[in-house]
Structures are given as C-alpha cells and as structure tokens.
Amino acid sequence: MEKKTFYITTPIYYPSDKLHIGHSYCTVATDAIARYKRLQGYDVMFLTGTDEHGQKIETKAKEAGMTPQEFVDHIVEGERGILDLWKLMNISNDRFIRTTDDYHCAAIQKIFKTMYEKGDIYKGTYKGKYCTPCESFWTESQLVDGKCPDCGREVKDAEEEAYFFRLSKYADRIQHLLED
C-alpha cells in the first residue's frame, strides 16, 4: 500500500532582522503537525525558509555596511541565526528554502516566463502611500492620521513599475469553484 503524502510549510520568513517569538511559535506549531502526520504514517514534506528580496533588506544591508546577500547570509547562517535557532529547537523540517538559491531563481524565472507568455502576467504602474518598514502600500482611506495603520510611521507617495496577475482571465472559473 502506498503511503499518503502530506505537505506543510511555514511562511517563508522575511529576514530583515533577527527572528522574534512569532516566528518560533509558527514554526513550532508547523513542526508539531508535521511530526503528528509522520506518526500517522504519512510521507511528510515540511518546508520552511526565507524570502530574501526587498527594499527593507537592501536598506538594512546598506545601514550595516554589507551587500544584501551578506546581510541575509548573516541573519540565516550566522551565529545564532535562523538555522542555529531551528537546530536548537530541534525543528524537523525536510527543506529550508532561500529565495536567493540558484535553483529557486531558475525555477521562478521559468514559471514567470511561461505565465508572461500566456498573458497571465502584465506590466503596469502602481501608485500609493508606501511604508518602507512594513513594505506595504496603503490607500489614503486606510491611513490613520496620515500614517501607516500597522506601525504608525510616516508613509511616502510612491509609484513603481510592477507586474500584475491577470485575475480577470480566470474570473469565470473562480466563480464556478466558489459556487460549487
């Protein structure tokens, strides 16, 4: 009889600073589920990792006098970094993914190219109020006294070229799935 499979993942954490208790809580909860499923006889794939791209990392790296890659390497692999913490906590993940890994970059580029060629992704411009520490765009109505509703810091007007997913292409299928 073939084993049933079970896939579980934490969010891929954003390593702009040392982890906090929320990261540990989420990872321990995910680990507990993975271990339980293994005890039930499932073939489990437990993934965790880091999303190592973004303005906040670039800014923090510059402040630390490092390149972005050096900065995230220190957070992930350095003494008392993420990998040390997960080892100390005996986390049973099967895979630790880093979005800067060559294989990950190649896979994402292939997926992106395919979706772009099919018209699922298109380039456009996004405008809004931007909070750099939170890496979030906000509308005017979402702001609290003109500041970021999450952290209370000042926001700035920002406009950037971005890629968008053409959700409208799948509207009928999504509607059908929601109704059934």
What are the functions of these language-model segments?
Residues 1-180:
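N-terminal, positively charged nucleic-acid-binding surface of large information/translation enzymes
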